[in-house]
């Protein structure tokens, strides 16, 4: 399954610089003026996972295949975007196609870099973007309510219940509250509405506090304020320096680690973002290990073996028989499949087995 992260923010907060660094690309214009991103830029990035390297040391495959994550650099939003201001609705629709919103927020002072609102204020910036997302959701939900009203009058099955919840959700949005904070968001009707409408304010949000080189090791006042706000709203804050992320491009893993350590940082911005996105979306990885390739596969936590097998090929799910499973720890400890098998650590699991993060799996199937 694919994971897509939309990078949003006001103009000139470091979005495109961050995108370029995270994707090790230079295809997103990065300049000191609003709307330098005219079209949304997309790039696929490997999900870093050191476990793949350890598996490869044992198996010695022809290639290593990481899971992939898509980053989408979305043009800077401004007040009125939901009504077509700035670059408008087209870019709100680009956000709609993503699973996670990475909201880059400027948390540094620099006179030479203009701010579209005239000064640095992270919480104001966050509220501007949030308001535009909510307003766009209100417009879309209102159209759905018109349709549901007609269906309810025609006594279509489930229409009255859906209409009742949709009106309740609209009231919630009209109070300036995100769909993600709606009290009944676990209900089946809510989930169906969100799946159909892909409401923007229902998406998982990660705030990227973009600091300068001096603010990377300790939180400045801007970051502290953003973290306090995020905590109240059940969101995560990742502190990153777009300039430092750019400097990491082209460095080996060892060089990157040394460079980050010298700055008092344990993890790159990319690693933080992916780790947090995985956690927010309830994603895990399992592995397949053979002489042709060692590969990581991304699935939802709680998936049973046949469903997990479907990300390789639908036939694996349709014709599922059994799954041979070795935990990552046992695979490493016993030096591979043969050693794990001799130690009694290879298990045969059936259709009800819930796959765990790090499982090394081989599927038996017949179509």
Regions found by a protein language model. Name each.
Residues 1-114, 143, 148:
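Conserved G1/Walker A P-loop phosphate-binding module
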Residues 2-8, 13, 19, 147-354, ...:
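C-terminal-of-GTPase-core extension/linker across diverse P-loop GTPases
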Residues 22, 84-87, 116-119, 220-224, ...:
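Short, glycine/charged-enriched secondary-structure capping and boundary segments
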Residues 25-33, 40-42, 50, 54, ...:
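Residue-level signal for pocket-adjacent positions within structured domains
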Residues 35, 49-52, 65-71, 85-99, ...:
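Amphipathic alpha-helical transducer elements in NTP-driven molecular machines
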Residues 43-48, 75-85, 96-159, 172-186, ...:
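Conserved Switch II/interswitch segment of TRAFAC-class P-loop GTPases
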Residues 59, 129-133, 242:
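A ubiquitous short alpha-helical element
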């Amino acid at each position: 399954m694919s994971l897509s992260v939309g990078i949003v923010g006001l103009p000139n907060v470091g979005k495109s610089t961050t995108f370029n660094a995270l994707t090790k690309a230079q295809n997103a214009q990065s300049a000191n003026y609003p709307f330098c991103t005219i079209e949304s830029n997309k790039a696929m990035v490997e999900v870093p996972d050191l476990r793949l390297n350890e598996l490869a040391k044992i198996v010695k495959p022809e290639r290593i295949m990481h899971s992939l994550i898509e980053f989408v650099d979305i043009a800077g939003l401004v007040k009125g975007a939901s009504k077509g201001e700035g670059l408008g609705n087209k870019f709100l629709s680009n956000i709609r196609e993503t699973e996670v919103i990475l909201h880059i927020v400027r948390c540094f002072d620099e006179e030479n870099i203009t701010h579209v609102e005239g000064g640095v204020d992270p919480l104001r910036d966050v509220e501007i973007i949030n308001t535009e997302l909510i307003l766009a959701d209100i417009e879309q939900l209102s159209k759905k309510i018109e349709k549901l009203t007609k269906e309810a009058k025609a006594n279509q099955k489930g229409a009255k219940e859906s209409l009742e919840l949709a009106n309740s959700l609209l009231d919630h949005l009209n109070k300036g509250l995100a769909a993600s904070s709606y009290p009944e968001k676990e209900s089946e009707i809510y989930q169906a509405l969100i799946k159909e409408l892909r409401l923007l304010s229902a998406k998982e949000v990660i705030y990227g506090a973009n600091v300068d080189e001096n603010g990377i090791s300790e939180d400045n006042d801007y970051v502290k304020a953003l973290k306090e706000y995020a905590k109240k709203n059940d969101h995560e804050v990742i502190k990153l320096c777009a300039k430092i992320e750019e400097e990491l491009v082209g460095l080996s893993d060892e060089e990157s680690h040394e460079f980050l350590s010298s700055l008092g940082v344990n993890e790159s911005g990319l690693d933080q973002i992916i780790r947090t996105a995985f956690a927010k979306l309830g994603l895990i990885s399992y592995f397949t290990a053979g002489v042709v390739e060692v590969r990581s596969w991304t699935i939802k936590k709680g998936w049973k073996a046949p469903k997990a097998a479907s990300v390789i090929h639908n036939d694996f799910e349709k014709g599922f028989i059994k799954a041979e499973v070795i935990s990552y720890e046992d695979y490493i400890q016993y030096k591979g499949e043969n050693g794990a098998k001799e130690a009694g650590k290879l298990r045969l699991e059936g259709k009800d087995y819930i796959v765990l993060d790090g499982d090394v799996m081989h599927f038996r199937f017949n179509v």
